[in-house]
């Protein structure tokens, strides 16, 4: 259940472009969107009048409650400020773009910050890459197909309840994508029994259906699959294909940087 969503913005067009996604999800769950800007005290252009630069609610979304606030960065790392603020507000989800202003003095939603939030946040986070040659190409305010990427590890099921909840609310198709890295042994049943249990534990047995399987070169394969099948969201943990190692994996990082749609992830 999503009751509160954090949307960080640096007021740039790119950062604000992720706002419709936050609002679209909030509308489905009757959730509140907390739209925040992290102000650098050294920037004379950031004042209380800057709240007028916050993105306006999309047409038809006026019923969604949006709270706007400017908070000081101080000497803190922007990613840490975002994660700490999300926890303090009791947010269930963070939605942000992966690029904002490139000016050093005003830039805080760059790839490094977005990836740090995705890598370290215990709160589920949706990252939409909205800048560059491999930017998000699908509409980000609607859901018809959600891809749940799993390596069958117990940790990989942690993102499934939220992905399933979004699919249930939006009536999107939730597709299970079972991935096997080079050298991984595939179960005799292809992972069906494990996935059936994952979906049952997530309260989403009715969404479980056909399983797709990918072998080797997992990051590239997931990105290619998401593009070919017009996925609107990829859901995964940052430990995808980790083999027990801690931290974000190269596979998860590649998907986060190259997926043709927003990526929903969590640190397990």
Residue ranges and their predicted role:
Residues 1-52, 60-63, 141-190, 199-210, ...:
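Small/aliphatic-rich secondary-structure junction motif
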Residues 196-199, 217-227:
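A short, acidic, amphipathic alpha-helical segment used as a generic capping/interface helix at domain edges
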């Amino acid at each position: 259940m999503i009751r509160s969503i954090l949307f960080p913005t640096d007021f740039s067009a790119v950062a604000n472009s992720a706002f419709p996604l936050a609002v679209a999800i909030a509308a489905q769950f009757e959730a509140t969107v907390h739209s925040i800007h992290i102000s650098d005290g050294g920037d004379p252009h950031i004042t209380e009048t800057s709240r007028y630069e916050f993105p306006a609610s999309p047409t038809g979304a006026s019923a969604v409650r949006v709270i706007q606030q400017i908070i000081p960065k101080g000497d803190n790392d922007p990613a840490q400020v975002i994660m700490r603020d999300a926890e303090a507000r009791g947010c269930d989800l963070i939605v942000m773009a992966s690029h904002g202003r490139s000016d050093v003095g005003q830039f805080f939603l760059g790839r490094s910050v977005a990836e740090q939030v995705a890598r370290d946040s215990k709160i589920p986070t949706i990252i939409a890459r909205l800048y560059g040659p491999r930017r998000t190409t699908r509409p980000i305010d609607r859901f018809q197909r959600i891809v749940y990427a799993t390596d069958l590890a117990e940790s990989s099921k942690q993102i499934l309840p939220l992905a399933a909840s979004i699919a249930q609310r939006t009536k999107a198709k939730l597709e299970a994508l079972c991935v096997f890295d080079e050298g991984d042994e595939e179960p005799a049943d292809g992972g069906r029994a494990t996935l059936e249990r994952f979906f049952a534990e997530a309260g989403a047995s009715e969404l479980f259906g056909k399983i797709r399987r990918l072998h080797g070169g997992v990051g590239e394969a997931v990105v290619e699959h998401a593009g070919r099948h017009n996925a609107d969201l990829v859901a995964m943990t940052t430990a995808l294909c980790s083999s027990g190692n801690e931290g974000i994996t190269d596979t998860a990082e590649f998907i986060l940087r190259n997926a043709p749609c927003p990526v929903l992830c969590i640190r397990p």
